[in-house]
From Swiss-Prot:
<comment type="pathway">
    <text>Metabolic intermediate biosynthesis; chorismate biosynthesis; chorismate from D-erythrose 4-phosphate and phosphoenolpyruvate: step 2/7.</text>
</comment>
<keyword id="KW-0479">Metal-binding</keyword>
<dbReference type="Pfam" id="PF24621">
    <property type="entry name" value="DHQS_C"/>
</dbReference>
<dbReference type="GO" id="GO:0005737">
    <property type="term" value="C:cytoplasm"/>
</dbReference>
<dbReference type="GO" id="GO:0003856">
    <property type="term" value="F:3-dehydroquinate synthase activity"/>
</dbReference>
<dbReference type="InterPro" id="IPR030963">
    <property type="entry name" value="DHQ_synth_fam"/>
</dbReference>
<dbReference type="GO" id="GO:0008652">
    <property type="term" value="P:amino acid biosynthetic process"/>
</dbReference>
<dbReference type="Pfam" id="PF01761">
    <property type="entry name" value="DHQ_synthase"/>
</dbReference>
<keyword id="KW-0520">NAD</keyword>
<feature type="binding site">
    <location>
        <position position="247"/>
    </location>
    <ligand>
        <name>Zn(2+)</name>
    </ligand>
</feature>
<keyword id="KW-0862">Zinc</keyword>
<feature type="binding site">
    <location>
        <position position="142"/>
    </location>
    <ligand>
        <name>NAD(+)</name>
    </ligand>
</feature>
<dbReference type="GO" id="GO:0000166">
    <property type="term" value="F:nucleotide binding"/>
</dbReference>
<feature type="binding site">
    <location>
        <begin position="71"/>
        <end position="76"/>
    </location>
    <ligand>
        <name>NAD(+)</name>
    </ligand>
</feature>
<dbReference type="InterPro" id="IPR016037">
    <property type="entry name" value="DHQ_synth_AroB"/>
</dbReference>
<dbReference type="InterPro" id="IPR030960">
    <property type="entry name" value="DHQS/DOIS_N"/>
</dbReference>
<feature type="binding site">
    <location>
        <position position="151"/>
    </location>
    <ligand>
        <name>NAD(+)</name>
    </ligand>
</feature>
Length: 359
């Protein structure tokens, strides 16, 4: 087992990474202070790992209940969030009840938001079961739900007590979900660590094959990078926005097609191709680096051309973005691997990128 710490003073927490961690009672025990636990999971993950988690919690002598949500990005909304609150209120959960998010990014984001809101804040633990959630969404305290007009526009910054990333859970992940997680790994290397990007290029096939050593390193290094960014800028006042490389275009794709049509990581992968193209057009990135970025995204079996939503629709959707200011779209662009710039771009350059990178 590897442990990475997120240094946030009195709200610091560990990220435990390894195989077989869902069943290890001792990893949960220090973070559960009250008399009850509510597991929040979904219809796909509960049959796979729910019993193992409940067995791990049993020796703690707590009252354990489970809320099972429908599976998918399409359900990341108020209606599904209320199912969590319904369960908590029905079970008479109190301020010391610990929520445990067992699932991917949708489960983790909604459980964290419910924890932030219920009785104005109860503790929660992240147990991410997808590669995307292990390398990205479970770390850093971003929680929330989608709105029909924009992704993740309603939410809160609320840190977990711990993240327990069991890479053994990745063996049951569908291929599309695995590729979606690799997209976030690629993003992390591209924005923050040129050496890690080199490693990803050399090991993308090992990740595709789910080789445990490659997966463990990808999760560890991604978490180290994200932990250091979050520690420096917890509430995305500046530096943390670099983690949104590929997300301005990507979120537009998700909202434009309808949530769940493309996986989040698929949209981010394509969004990085689009952001790379725009980076070259603005004279920030060299063509050879753009080609390397496109090649590794394609090697991860991610889409490299976006849907033809139309220029006007893309622009409208990208204005509904947390980085936008006074309606002006801001993009995270690459200068070189490991070095980014957050900037506006002329409409003509964006239109040229859309013409080049959409169907």
């Amino acid at each position: 087992m590897i442990t990475v710490n997120v240094d946030l003073g009195d709200r610091a927490y560990p990220i435990h990474i390894g195989a077989g961690l869902i069943g290890r009672t001792e990893l949960f025990a220090p973070h559960i202070k009250g008399s009850s636990v509510t597991i929040v999971t979904n219809t796909t993950v509960d049959p796979l790992y729910g019993d193992a988690l409940r067995a791990a919690l049993a020796p703690l002598g707590k009252r354990v209940s489970t809320v099972v949500l429908p599976d998918g990005e399409a359900y990341k909304n108020w209606e599904t969030l209320n199912l969590i609150f319904d369960g908590l209120l029905t079970d008479h959960a109190d301020r010391k009840t610990t929520l445990v998010a067992l699932g991917g990014g949708v489960v983790g984001d909604m459980t964290g938001f419910a924890a932030a809101c219920y009785m104005r804040g109860v503790p929660f633990i992240q147990v991410p079961t997808t590669l995307l959630s292990q390398v990205d969404s479970s770390v850093g305290g971003k929680t929330g739900i989608n709105h029909p007009l924009g992704k993740n526009m309603i939410g809160a910054f609320y840190q977990p007590q711990a993240v327990i990333a069991d890479i053994g859970a990745l063996t049951t992940l569908p291929d599309r979900e695995l590729a979606a997680g690799v997209a976030e790994v690629i993003k992390t290397g591209a924005i923050a660590d040129a050496g890690f990007f080199d490693w990803i290029e050399a090991n993308v096939e090992a990740l595709n094959r789910r080789e445990p050593a490659a997966l463990a390193h990808a999760v560890k290094r991604s978490c180290e990078i994200k932990a250091s960014v979050v520690a420096a800028d917890e509430r995305e006042g500046g530096l943390r926005a670099i983690l949104n490389f590929g997300h301005t275009f990507g979120h537009a794709i998700e909202a434009g097609l309808g949530y769940g049509e493309w996986l989040h990581g698929e949209a981010v992968g394509c969004g990085m191709v689009m952001a790379g193209d725009l980076s070259v057009r603005l004279g920030l990135l060299d063509e050879a680096s753009r080609q390397r970025l496109d090649a590794v995204i394609a090697a991860a079996h991610l889409p490299t051309r976006g849907p033809a939503l139309g220029d006007a629709r893309y622009m409208d959707l990208m204005r509904v973005d947390k980085k936008a200011e006074a309606g002006a779209i801001k993009f995270v662009l690459l200068k070189r691997f490991g070095d980014t710039l957050i900037t506006q771009a002329p409409d003509e350059a964006v239109f040229a990128t859309l013409a080049q990178t959409t169907r």
